[in-house]
Amino acid sequence: MSDYVYNLVKKHHSVRKFKNKPLSEDVVKKLVEAGQSASTSSFLQAYSIIGIDDEKIKENLREVSGQPYVVENGYLFIFVIDYYRHHLVDQHAETDMENAYGSTEGLLVGAIDAALVAENIAVTAEDMGYGIVFLGSLRNDVERVREILDLPDYVFPVFGMAVGEPADDENGAAKPRLPFDHVFHHNKYHADKETQYAQMADYDQTISEYYDQRTNGNRKETWSQQIEMFLGNKARLDMLEQLQKSGLIQR
């Protein structure tokens, strides 16, 4: 049994600095085809991928994201929940399918489909020697992204992905993940608070030491402190409104 794929995914880390080398059309096609091979719920294929190489569009999206690598990359992918095709089928159907694709379950199916496709693309890109970084920051202004990309109803931008050749060999490193015993529950969920607190304390120490070493002492925050800062910042509170404007979560 080969550990090639295991070792590949274990090395994953976000890359935020890329060489100024655009991906070829052949590479883009292969990445998309790899993404399409991902599992999809009930064969709905409730997603689409928008490829961006137009510099003006990239710049407009950078203004939403606030991140330079939205522009400075080899290629930019945008992943969307897409029920527009299903809506067109619905126009000639005898049943009202919108009850399904306009539901909360429909949202989950589309989001999961898009994520599975994107992960396939990410792993394939890394196998080719490229680096990637996911871009949830495009949800900072969903309405503006929908305008930039001319998205119809029943299509919702979930996240993006910048891909390209890493600018150097030291362009990031894999962060220590939560230990195996923290995330793997055998047969049932184990919610004992004392055990959870002890595990988090150990992990907080690991993360603090990681940042301390990586930044020569400039950062020492724990994982818990990061979570408090991120989840305590009440951002993107308009998601439900934006989803409903797109024709999703109507029930």
UniProtKB/Swiss-Prot annotation:
Pfam families documented for this protein: Nitroreductase (PF00881)
Keywords: Flavoprotein, FMN, NADP, Oxidoreductase
Keyword NADP carried by entry: yes
EC identifiers of the protein: 1.6.-.-
UniProt xrefs under Gene3D superfamilies: NADH Oxidase
Cofactors: FMN
Gene Ontology terms, MF aspect: oxidoreductase activity
Taxonomy, superkingdom: Bacteria
NCBIfam families tied to this protein: PRK10765.1
Entries under PANTHER family matching the protein: NADPH-DEPENDENT OXIDOREDUCTASE, OXYGEN-INSENSITIVE NADPH NITROREDUCTASE
Family the entry assigns: Belongs to the flavin oxidoreductase frp family.
Function, as annotated: Reduces FMN, organic nitro compounds and disulfide DTNB. Involved in maintenance of the cellular redox state and the disulfide stress response.
Name used for this protein in its record: NADPH-dependent oxidoreductase
Taxonomic placement: Bacteria, Bacillati, Bacillota, Bacilli, Bacillales
